[in-house]
């Protein structure tokens, strides 16, 4: 579900605990992304793809979904772009 920024900003201004939770979540996401970038820069193609799938698994699990079975909603091209790999490499 999408909440327009102006509405979320207004609500978080009125509810300090909501603002704190949003900041906590954003900080966690930024930290996770930074760690992924560092890891990916040191990995070969196979390791990058494995780390990507593992990261998705952990995120699904944290949200109460199955960590073992989930649908990849990104295309091979999108995954390749995210990981800095070609579509052919992702397809292998």
Curated annotation (Swiss-Prot):
[4Fe-4S] cluster binds at residue 1. Its cofactor is [4Fe-4S] cluster. Keywords: 4Fe-4S, Activator, Cytoplasm, DNA-binding, Iron, Iron-sulfur, Metal-binding, Transcription, Transcription regulation. Induction: By anaerobiosis. Residues 43-92 form the HTH crp-type domain. It is involved in the activation of genes necessary for anaerobic respiration. Homodimer. GO terms for molecular function: 4 iron, 4 sulfur cluster binding; DNA binding; metal ion binding. Binds 1 [4Fe-4S] cluster per subunit. One of its GO terms (cellular component) is cytoplasm. Its main location: cytoplasm. GO terms for biological process: regulation of DNA-templated transcription. This is Anaerobic regulatory protein. It comes from Aggregatibacter aphrophilus (Haemophilus aphrophilus). It is found in: Cytoplasm. The keyword Membrane does not apply. Pfam families: Crp.
């Amino acid at each position: 579900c999408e909440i327009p920024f102006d509405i979320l900003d207004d609500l978080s201004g009125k509810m300090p605990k909501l603002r704190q939770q949003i900041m906590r979540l954003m900080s966690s996401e930024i930290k996770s992304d930074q760690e992924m970038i560092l890891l990916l820069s040191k990995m070969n193609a196979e390791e990058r793809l494995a780390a990507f799938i593992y990261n998705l698994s952990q995120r699904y699990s944290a949200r109460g979904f199955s960590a073992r079975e989930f649908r990849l909603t990104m295309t091979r091209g999108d995954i390749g772009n995210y990981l800095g790999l070609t579509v052919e490499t992702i397809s292998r």
